[in-house]
Amino acid sequence: MGEICPRREDFDIDYILKNASLLEKVSLLAGYDFWHTAPLPRFNVPSVRVSDGPNGVRGTKFFDGVRAACLPCGTGLAATWDQSLLYDAGVLIGQECLAKGAHCWLVPTVCIQRSPLGGRGFESFAEDPYATGKLAAAYIRGAQSTGVISTIKHFAANDQEHERISVNAVMSERALREVHLLPFQIAIADSAPGAVMTCYNKVNGQHLSESKEMLDGLLRREWGWKGLIMSDWFGTYSTAEALNAGLGLEMPGTTRLRGPLLELAISSRKVSRATLDERARTVLEFVQRARKAEVSAVESTRDFPEDRRLNRKLAADSIVLLKNESGLLPLNPQTLTSVALIGPNMKTAAFCGGGSASLQPYYSTSPYQGITSQLPPGVEVLYETGATSYAFIPELEASEVRTPEGQPGLRMRFYRDPPSVQERRVLMGFSNPELDRLFYADIEAELIAPATGPFQFGLAVYGSASLFLNDQLIIDNTTVQRGGTFFFGKGTLEETATVDLVQGQSYQIKVQFASGPSSKLVKPGVVNFGGGAGRLGMVQVVDPERAIARAVEAAKRADITILGVGLTRDHESEGFDRSHMDLPPAVASLVTAVLDVAPDAILLTQSGTPFSMLPWADLVKTHLHAWFGGNELGNGIADVLFGVVNPSGKLPLSFPRRIEDTPTYLNFGSERGQVTYGEGIYVGYKLLRKSPTSCALSIRARFVVHLLCVLRFDGRHRVRYTECSKLGRRGRSGSSPAVYRGRSNNVVNRTSHQGAQRISKGGFAAR
């Protein structure tokens, strides 16, 4: 960790509010830049840094940021059902914030996953509001124990990405309070986060960032909450309305709807001086609390052994054993002579979801790396991809190309003028002050073909771009553009071209790029982050039938087959929702083909939210589900497979067989600017009673033999039970009993609330 940033002397808030000018007070109510609050040097008020990242602290860059610890995604953490473990995870996050120079962490997300298709569903915890609130509170308490401020978000019902800044979420008062507000209410009461972030969407006709009823009425007066209320990034839509409603801080800076507009609102008496002072006070109190965190003076790293151990435990304890019908698990590596490791997720370290969850990890471990590291020498490993599962063509790696100067990677040059202008002047750096909103760039590299055969190139862009190979145009993403999911949903569809290459031959790559304002796309309801973005990919074309045939042959030869399939951040991301629950097309064919020749194959699936398991759901005998598992994904999986850790994870979400079986099948996504929450309070398992949310098995085949529930005088319940195990093997042991609490014989239909807590038993399983 870098040198500690020196603290400034404290400041007197009452004195500032009495003596600061109108312009100074107004300046406090919007960000200074993308990641910092505005300072008041005259009063010794510093600028404080905020940082995003639901599974790690990203720092101040969207791309190529400082490396960071990556924890399992929110649903993975929730699968542990372990509040003390989430507290420890929060402490690690807080320490990462300090290393990155961040006073405030813009997490956690507690919006309920009402549909499996929600793009950011993996960021939140569980479909049960009580469980989500309790787990979030533990996470927040851990982070804030380091002095860092935590920001709970997105208040409220921000559970879909489709037209997220304009969609109106229409629901009953009961559904709003019992499902979508309850996680916030519980977490705020139990952990006192330093800030609340409002959502992009409307609820019952009004944007939350300008709802006086929700911010001043419910959050402030009814719940008695005193902290800062900030907007989501570019989620402020008015000046006077938002300020009068209770929104203290517009983010990011520089301001769009405050500054001179707020000065005008005050002079025209649409906003009173008293209201201005109230909002300025909440910002100053936030800064005063945040400045006490002992943050690093520069963005730095802290990849310590104890952090790795905790992250490995988080990854392992989140894994859910869904089936062990043949009793195959745990595997004894000493008895194996050959292992087939098959599937597109086997060598892919799907450690995080997309969007705000993306970061540069200190390191990552794929399932392949984790499994092979625990195999004895001499065990034959048969690896086959079997199928492709990417939604975007894999990005060009620096090792595959070199700059015109001979260095690994691509060279990018920025210009104010388009390529048609003669003798353009190169401007150094993306943040050059001479660059206008509309700017241009040339990206160049030399590619040495790694093999002979057809290769597919892909180009997606926010802005416009064209790809040339040896001066020949192969992809035009400028003249005609089709809307896609790239860059938070603002960009184009990935356009592709297939070209035959010869191994060892040199090819010149050039991309002509223009920034965001050059885009021809008009997308309602999508956040505009400005700037521009592009993605360039290349992959060798693989015949799907041959790939499956090779995988089948490997499965026939091996003692044990482990099949790794699932989703990645290409499929689950901020900015877009999934259009279906299916895995990539070739994956289902791969699974059924392998199970046909190796019926005892171990299936390892990965995702942050539910996916369809048809047509192989009833064929597989041994099934583990892992999540986006962070840095230690592969090691955590291997620990469970080989019995180092007993899988105690439970599903925090219902995994329906088909999307048609979900309560939100007919009412998810914006239709004419509105989505109706027709399921009411019956979200997830509350409707799917026959498929309990917390379903899972344990290798040690535990069962309860005695159960006693006592209602205490203080109104709390105490549940006591005796648990036995049929198997015992050395390794970490534990269980996460799930308890459903509800009322019976009610005139009004009521749903249960779910709670659970992990119970550990030391080195051996109880017998």
From Swiss-Prot:
GO terms for biological process: cellulose catabolic process; glucan catabolic process. SMART domains: PA14. It comes from the Eukaryota. Glycans are attached at residues 19, 324, 477, 749. One of its GO terms (molecular function) is beta-glucosidase activity. Transmembrane segments: none annotated. The active site is at 232. GO terms for cellular component: extracellular region. Residues 727-767 are annotated as: Disordered. Its main location: secreted. Pfam families: Glyco_hydro_3 (PF00933), Glyco_hydro_3_C (PF01915), PA14 (PF07691). Pathway: Glycan metabolism; cellulose degradation. It is found in: Secreted. Belongs to the glycosyl hydrolase 3 family. Beta-glucosidases are one of a number of cellulolytic enzymes involved in the degradation of cellulosic biomass. Catalyzes the last step releasing glucose from the inhibitory cellobiose. This is Probable beta-glucosidase K.
